[in-house]
């Protein structure tokens, strides 16, 4: 089976056998300007991974594809503003035709939570959340050892919490979410401008400057950390997780975020969940995709075995 992680800047694929052993991986830049181009890249990267594993594509029984967006009953992703054309009708059917195998879809942050449950910090924890803070913001929720998606697949879309410094009534913020506007990649740059940081054009450069001792950059990072703490303070009383796993390109900067984040959380909330940085790093989503594909493949296999024994399935 194949797991595929689709991001704004890359497409990654991993091939695994039925034991879950990863036998090949491939990655390709994907600065696509259209959904059609991105779908073609998904197909080429997935097939390249299978070829690297030494198997023909016809032997791939299931592909799990993860990307930003809500995968509910609409037949196409919703709220996937970071990928061009991704919310239009027919996108999922086009991916199925491109891959020409059984395909399951899931939100990328949900996949990261599954990855942590399978091979990361969530292996021994039944109730935890994966808080992704990067270009976008989202939450993967595991309750009782199972992924929780809600009635319409939108559980964890915390980007739309009307929190932090962004005005939730602003039309631009309603499109991408007030919390994402405040603490996502653009929020880091906004905080940097507010504190007087000069020359930084990416969130990574702001963190690099802070790590190098730039006081204004450290102030900007502290503002972002306080916004993350506000998000956690809103989440914890509702879900009561034993563990909050921070992930994403911003969330993984624990050396800079932890002290102001925990200080602000102490000021905001009486609840003290354990907070850790993802042990899987940027591999979390891909491992989750493989885990989802593995579950789907095993379900198909056992259904066929039961059907062969005359068991109703």
Regions found by a protein language model. Give the residues of each.
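Phosphate-binding/catalytic loop of phosphoryl-transfer enzymes
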Residues: 4, 18, 59-177, 293-313
